[in-house]
A protein has these predicted regions:
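Extracytoplasmic/periplasmic, Sec-exported soluble proteins
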Residues: 35-42, 84-95, 141-149, 194
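Short, solvent-exposed beta-strand/turn patches at coil↔beta or beta↔helix junctions
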Residues: 68-97, 128-141
């Protein structure tokens, strides 16, 4: 075999390897694209169902549906808890009695149920604390308070579920997260909006990210 023939064979082998590699890359890319599209579709459909279910209630509850973060945010601190307290106000309990069963019914619909990774209850506070606490101490005081509050919300809504299968599924997805003042809400002039920063959010996380990570790991 001449050198030119050998080079031709090597080039063919290299070309074949390149084609196989590119095909593999394209397959993985298509899988990830498909998951991303499915995630986007699922997020839009969940948002639309939440809007349809709660549009008439959100303003009454002083709540906001955020389609970007897939969350419902309760923003009126006066109806949530007493100042400095983790105990739920009766009015907030009545809101949760109306909100959560309908909320969880949407998420346990067969078209969404297997896509739900986590339902986060997030407690947020302003940066201030009563007295002359330093900003550092105020942060940790508010961290403890926000954690206590989300735990109380978690305890209350779970106590209202009587169906054992639904309770088991909800417990496997629901988490309580106290975040103190780490995610403040700001006014247009970039000053802290202390009232709106004090809030409770129910945030939905789908498993699209985990599916993409699994594909990437399998492709290594």
């Amino acid at each position: 075999m001449s050198i030119s023939d050998l080079m031709s064979v090597l080039m063919m082998i290299f070309l074949f390897i390149s084609i196989v590699y590119m095909r593999s890359v394209n397959l993985e890319k298509n899988k990830i694209t498909s998951i991303a599209q499915t995630y986007e579709t699922t997020q839009v459909e969940i948002t639309n169902d939440l809007k349809k279910e709660f549009t008439k209630n959100l303003q009454i509850w002083n709540a906001v549906l955020d389609s970007l973060t897939l969350s419902i945010r309760f923003e009126n601190p006066e109806i949530l808890f007493n100042v400095g307290s983790a105990e739920l106000n009766d009015h907030f309990k009545s809101i949760l009695d109306s909100f959560f069963p309908r909320f969880i019914q949407i998420l346990t619909d067969p078209k969404y149920k297997n896509d739900i990774e986590e339902i986060r209850i997030e407690g947020h506070t302003s940066s201030e604390w009563a007295g002359e606490s330093s900003p550092y101490q105020a942060y940790f005081n508010n961290m403890e308070l926000s954690q206590d509050r989300t735990r109380k919300v978690l305890e209350y809504i779970l106590s209202q579920i009587k169906d054992e299968q639904l309770l088991h599924w909800t417990k496997s997805k629901l988490t309580a997260n106290g975040l103190s003042s780490s995610h403040l809400i700001y006014n247009p002039n970039q000053t802290e909006n202390k009232e709106r920063s004090r809030r409770v959010e129910f945030k939905i996380k789908t498993n699209a990210e985990q599916q993409i990570i699994r594909i990437l790991e399998q492709s290594k």
